[in-house]
Amino acid sequence: MNITSSKWRIIILVGIVLYFIYIHQRLHIRPDHIFLALLILTLAFGKKGARKFLFDWMPFIIFWMLYDMMRGVADSWRGIIHIKDIYDAELWLFGPLFGGKIPSFFLQDFQHAIAGSGIKKIFDLAAADLYTIHFAIPLLAGWILWHTTNDRAMFYRFAYTMTILNVLALTTFFLFPSAPPWYVMRYGFAQPQGELIGAAGSLVSVDELLKVKFFTTIWDHFNPNYFAAVPSLHGSYPIVVILFMYKKFKKHLPLLLLYPILTWCAAVYLNHHYVIDLIIGGIYTLIAYLVMSKILFPFIFEKTIFRSGITATFPEKLKKEEAILAEKQVIT
């Protein structure tokens, strides 16, 4: 669709209206909803560069909307929560390596053993930092591809690998709701009843260290779905990021690999994920990449968007347009 057309703007406007109707009915309208809507409208009705930014980055915006909207449907649509089967599989696979315990519980015992020490504070802060930059790092990687290196084709491959991954993950969250290890540690294998607390896991230690309730508040009150452990997006996003950073720059692979490895360790250390969750997240990443590279990009994007020139580099197109306009002014 031509992003300069009024029809495209009408679609955006109607989409925003429907979005507000939905969240008003299922949730409650928050300031961040209003901010996001105003941002989208500003870009949609802005200059050509702004509209192209919105068009290219729309997959990330739509995912955030859908993920946030899970607050209104996750509790009412889900069936039986998978609790013991995931735990038993983790114990069977990794119990012999961790003294008959699952890795996350083994690390909880380790934390208790070093409680109050400086090394525990370092581990807690490092794990919290890695865990909380989860959503920011993919956006930074996207910005590097889209703006810094101005590689629109690579950005599309990255963005739609993320999109396919997110679609697969959201579908799984609904069809296979699964409890993380912090739930088993606090509630056992019983199905959830009423309001849940403790979703921050070992991030509570960081709150206690900093004398705040930041992580407790975020995970207990702003988490859209407590039972979205499989697949682990903390396990999959870092792989997508380092895959495309290496494809683009062809250097520093050992250093890049540290990011997913440390993030996986943080997810287990904080009692938020089983190792199985992370492995499944990695498998989902491979599937998403193959679908993007073998089907979506060659059969759709190369024959539509890139052929039409929608994703031509902004600076080059803007310079050409300015030159044409200046030439017309000189002639007149």
Q: What is the predicted role of each segment?
A:
Residues 57, 139-176, 181-193:
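Interfacial segments of alpha-helical transmembrane regions
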Residues 291-327:
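Membrane-proximal cytoplasmic C-terminal regulatory module of class A 7TM GPCRs
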Residues 54-137:
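Intramembrane catalytic core of multi-pass membrane enzymes that act on lipidic substrates
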Residues 1-12:
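N-terminal membrane topogenic signal
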Residues 175-248:
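Membrane-interfacial catalytic/cofactor-binding modules of polytopic membrane enzymes
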Residues 140-147, 235-253, 283-294:
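Membrane-interfacial alpha-helical segments at the cytosolic side of multi-pass membrane proteins
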Residues 19-31, 42-53:
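Short, hydrophobic transmembrane alpha-helix segments
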Residues 180-183, 229, 262-287:
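Interfacial helix-loop-helix junctions of multi-pass membrane proteins
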